Amino acid sequence: MRKSTAVDFRWMAAFVLLSWLGEVIHNRIELPQLSLLSPEYSATGLISFGLFLVWWKVSKRWGGILLLGWALLNLIGGAIVSVIPFSFLPFYPEQSLQHYLMHVVYGVAQIPLIVLLIRDLRLRSASDGLKETSHETPAL
């Protein structure tokens, strides 16, 4: 039996959804005045969905790279940097246990997608390397 290198689109869809839901949970608790149609929800959801479609229908490699960048941006920028009161931020984040916990939820929700994408990109890269070497012309 051959080991498959392809990631099932249902797993990818589930982890993209989980990634977005991490942000939704954060925003519902921390920014309850926002409507579900506000850009903080709808724009990020559309970006996530659009990048998933690129991965699924257009290019696994480029879609995976773009999705990985988006998930890392959410993890580093959204879950980590934006909770620390840096002077360069245009806002002062609340320094409370609840706020920290919401950022932990937001960050942890990114990890399954990041792990899946790194695994998928590595397997595809290894698979492409095998294809390239198998097409070489033997030396005479």
Feature locations, PLM:
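Short, highly charged, low-complexity non-transmembrane loops/tails of multi-pass membrane proteins
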Residues: 125-140
